[in-house]
Amino acid sequence: HGPRPYSLPDFNMLGFNYRMTDLQGAVGVVQMGKLDTFIDERANWAAYYNDQLKSIDWLELPSINTNYKRGWQSYVVLVDESKSPKSRNEIMELLQEKGISTRPGTHAVHMLNYYKELMELNDDDFSQAKLANNCSMAIPLHNRMVEEDYEYIVKMLKSL
């Protein structure tokens, strides 16, 4: 077995690392010129996912509000484990076996050891954050993917 796709790192201390190299800065400047195109491509593929995945009753899809433009840094779904064929983690492992990289959609900050100890929190203190932590799943959405990649991901999700 390889790494577990559902395992996110825990953080034991608060810290910041905002340093950027000159090379990263130069690449960033070039990328900014492509930003609108990147965002438009991601929005189109997010709409494709929403259309293609809406028939899967155990997936809660992100809403698309036409009143504003979002960046689509990721495409995060929520797995309803009361309806799904397997748990979110098992689904992520099955997708990994089929070559599809997924990750949990978010951390529940109150479940990270640093904050848990600092604020004396319990996992059940924030039920919706816990649900998002345990049941969210980010599926691939990036600008190097092609139509066949998206079709394959949809096909594999529908086959579960």
Give, region by region, the residue ranges found by the protein language model.
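Conserved PLP-binding active-site segment of the aspartate aminotransferase-like
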Residues: 63-65, 73-83, 111-119, 134-147
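A short beta-strand-loop micro-motif that forms or neighbors metal/cofactor-
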Residues: 147-160
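Generic alpha-helical structural context detector
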Residues: 25-30, 51, 77, 93, ...
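Short helix-loop capping/hinge motifs at secondary-structure junctions, enriched
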Residues: 34, 82-85
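Active-site region of PLP-dependent enzymes
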Residues: 1-74, 110-113
